[in-house]
Amino acid sequence: MPGWSCLVTGAGGFLGQRIVQMLVQEKELQEVRVLYRTFSPKHKEELSKLQTKAKVTVLRGDIVDAQFLRRACQGMSVIIHTAAALDIAGFLPRQTILDVNVKGTQLLLDACVEASVPAFIYSSSTGVAGPNSYKETILNDREEEHRESTWSNPYPYSKRMAEKAVLAANGSILKNGGTFHTCALRLPFIYGEESQIISTMVNRALKNNSIIKRHATFSIANPVYVGNAAWAHILAARGLRDPEKSQSIQGQFYYISDDTPHQSYDDLNYTLSKEWGFCLDSSWSLPLPLLYWLAFLLETVSFLLRPFYNYRPPFNRFMVTILNSVFTISYKKAQRDLGYEPLVSWEEAKQKTSEWIGTLVEQHRETLDTKSQ
């Protein structure tokens, strides 16, 4: 495989940053373009730490800017598209989520065809497959089952529509006469150092006597460590560029997980943070069916008030369902086609994440000390 180049969208995000860190170590990589919507001093510092012979080009722009995307794609061999509006709680406007996740993805696909980029990898979500009900029990789901989410909520709907567009684009004829090859990686909840979701959980718990509020007691899931999620993207990029492997990858979607034990999200939060004195809230909580119907009531109130007032419920039925369902996946297809094996073991992932949580605890203590002086 000759020298190549890659564009990573969402490069400033939790997953995107880790992909870039791994990508620059790839052999014969000549250039990596990193697309940011906003480029902070922290992002600049992270890029300065990269040790690579490849040229690193920073691009600041919007995923819904067609002209910008066409310029960004010129001369690229591979696109890794991680940029997305992630919102399961319903706080972002529906149109914003659809614009970023659906329109942005389609504009990027169009730019690839125009710029004759031969390979495209999409960071999808297990949410495109479900769960559709908290009453469902889905264990070790496989791609062959072809499950599909029926939710109309903007996040799962938009990711499903975007994935369909990506896979439908496979086989398109590029402007130079070549063929466009695409695939999608369906990711569950991603944990690890720098996770904004875990950071928020920790900071809230620190303000609550180190007690972690329960939100997902009834779930059984298999989250994936960020390093392993990123590694799957690197393997997909290799595979689509390899004439021998590409044939079996083109137009396919893959579940990506690792050896993290199947557990509830609440238990995961506790396991990762217990070394620092955190504990789970032991107080009484609403039964799941009642919580679900309360969410329905709040959604109804929001709908009725919409002509007069923009009321955003604190939770909705989709959020209650996805956080309290039994839904696990198998990554055997990724093993077979991509050669995927987790790079980081559960024990190592747990240790790395716990150590990072320790730095958050220390920062909190330093802040309290400063305020008390």
UniProtKB/Swiss-Prot annotation:
Membrane-spanning segments: 288-308
Subcellular compartments: Endoplasmic reticulum membrane; Mitochondrion membrane
GO CC terms of this entry: cytoplasm; endoplasmic reticulum membrane; intracellular membrane-bounded organelle; mitochondrial membrane
Pathway assignment: Steroid metabolism
Membrane topology designation: Single-pass membrane protein
Residues that coordinate or bind NADP(+): 10-15, 155, 159
Keyword annotations from UniProtKB, A to Z: Acetylation, Endoplasmic reticulum, Lipid metabolism, Membrane, Mitochondrion, NADP, Oxidoreductase, Steroid metabolism, Transmembrane, Transmembrane helix
Primary subcellular site in the record, as a coarse category: endoplasmic reticulum
Enzyme class: oxidoreductase
Modified residues (N6-acetyllysine): 350
Enzyme Commission number(s): 1.1.1.270, 1.1.1.210
Catalysed transformations (reactions): a 3beta-hydroxysteroid + NADP(+) = a 3-oxosteroid + NADPH + H(+); 5alpha-androstane-3beta,17beta-diol + NADP(+) = 17beta-hydroxy-5alpha-androstan-3-one + NADPH + H(+); 3beta-hydroxy-5alpha-androstan-17-one + NADP(+) = 5alpha-androstan-3,17-dione + NADPH + H(+)
One Pfam family linked to the record: 3Beta_HSD
GO BP of this protein: C21-steroid hormone metabolic process; progesterone metabolic process; regulation of steroid biosynthetic process; steroid biosynthetic process
Active site: residue positions: 159 (proton donor)
Family classification: Belongs to the 3-beta-HSD family.
Job description of the protein: Catalyzes the conversion of dihydrotestosterone to its inactive form 5alpha-androstanediol, that does not bind androgen receptor/AR. Also converts androstanedione, a precursor of testosterone and estrone, to epiandrosterone. Does not function as an isomerase.
PANTHER family referenced in this protein's UniProt entry, alphabetically: BIFUNCTIONAL POLYMYXIN RESISTANCE PROTEIN ARNA, SHORT CHAIN DEHYDROGENASE_REDUCTASE FAMILY 42E, MEMBER 2
Protein name: NADPH-dependent 3-keto-steroid reductase Hsd3b5
Source organism per UniProt: Rattus norvegicus
Taxonomic path: Eukaryota, Metazoa, Chordata, Craniata, Vertebrata
Gene (name only): Hsd3b5
